[in-house]
UniProtKB/Swiss-Prot annotation:
The keyword Iron does not apply. SUPFAM superfamilies: Aminoacid dehydrogenase-like, N-terminal domain (SSF53223), NAD(P)-binding Rossmann-fold domains (SSF51735). Catalyzes the oxidation of 5,10-methylenetetrahydrofolate to 5,10-methenyltetrahydrofolate and then the hydrolysis of 5,10-methenyltetrahydrofolate to 10-formyltetrahydrofolate. This is Bifunctional protein FolD. GO terms for molecular function: methenyltetrahydrofolate cyclohydrolase activity; methylenetetrahydrofolate dehydrogenase (NADP+) activity. Belongs to the tetrahydrofolate dehydrogenase/cyclohydrolase family. Keywords: Amino-acid biosynthesis, Histidine biosynthesis, Hydrolase, Methionine biosynthesis, Multifunctional enzyme, NADP, One-carbon metabolism, Oxidoreductase, Purine biosynthesis. Coiled coil: none annotated. It comes from the Bacteria. Its EC number is 1.5.1.5, 3.5.4.9. The keyword rRNA-binding does not apply. Homodimer. Pathway: One-carbon metabolism; tetrahydrofolate interconversion. The gene is folD. It comes from Neisseria meningitidis serogroup B (strain ATCC BAA-335 / MC58).
Length: 284
């Protein structure tokens, strides 16, 4: 048995098209033009690529994008002052500060400075808290993108055993909340988890985001499981791989996301959806 591939590129293109149509409809209705402000501090090459991809998605959707590229030497006060200006700007619907920030900056303080209704990354504690109490407002992009993928492929988490490997604030924790919201029975595994292989082997739905190449072995996976690999790692030979051992996993799983082309495109599509949602919040 070879698993069906979950095609994030295909699903993301449909979602981006839907956003583009909604943006065009807003313009016909004389509503203000959705606008995303993206802040990049320093010259990290990977971050520059991510920012460029986000700008390209904005162009596809007809969303206005503002770019702020600040030097590595930018102080905490200067960065917070920029966030304050963007918070106060009624033309700006979404604010995204690209992570990671240079080490001398306090990223948590910066994320908490963004107005929750403009927090299109969904990282503000207010938005994570809303998700926890079943009242989501701005949902973290990668976990929400995973849920969109599951829905697109007819996978209902209700009553299923879902296992999340990795407990980061960006993926693992909010992913567990999203799955809980969908009424799955959720287990979160982390660095202190004992018998990780047993936990993984019990998963009907497995989501892995630890940032370690091929961390989860194919033989651990329950036959017929759905495997969502959030990891993206560059190997010494320049190739990309996920956190799951793909070649062996696809022989046991029923469905699996490839890397690249699985979760990554969904993160950006969800960012566009969140920006559109933020614009609708600001219509009132």
């Amino acid at each position: 048995m070879s698993a069906q591939l979950i095609n994030g590129k295909e699903v993301s293109q449909k979602r981006l098209q839907a956003v583009a149509e909604a943006v065009a409809q807003r313009q016909q209705n004389n509503l203000h033009h959705p606008c995303l402000a993206v802040v990049l501090v320093g010259g990290d090459p990977a971050s520059a690529v991510y920012v460029r991809n986000k700008k390209t998605a904005c162009q596809k959707c007809g969303i206005k994008s503002l770019s702020y590229e600040l030097p590595e030497s930018t102080s905490q006060e200067e960065l917070l002052a920029l966030v304050d200006r963007l918070n106060a700007d009624s033309e700006v619907d979404g604010i995204l500060v690209q992570l990671p920030l240079p080490k001398h900056l306090d990223s948590q303080a910066v994320l908490e400075r963004i107005s929750p209704d403009k927090d299109v990354d969904g990282f503000h504690p207010y938005n994570v808290g809303r998700l926890a109490v079943k009242m989501p407002l701005m949902r973290p992009c990668t976990p929400k993108g995973v849920m969109t993928l599951l829905e697109a492929y007819g996978i209902d988490p209700k009553g299923k055993k879902a296992v999340v490997v990795g407990a980061s604030n960006i993926v693992g924790r909010p992913q567990a909340l999203e799955l809980l919201l969908a009424r799955a029975t959720v287990t979160v595994c982390h660095s202190a988890t004992e018998n990780l292989t047993d936990e993984v082997a019990g998963a009907d739905i497995l989501v892995v985001g630890v940032g370690i190449p091929n961390f989860v072995k194919g033989e651990w996976i329950k036959p017929g499981a759905v495997v969502i690999d959030v990891g993206i790692n560059r190997l010494d030979d320049g190739s990309l791989c996920g956190d799951v051992e793909f070649e062996t996993a696809k022989e046991r799983a029923a469905m699996i996301t490839p890397v690249p082309g699985g979760v990554g495109p969904m993160t950006i599509a969800t960012l566009m959806e969140n920006t559109l949602h933020a614009a609708s919040l600001h219509d009132a």
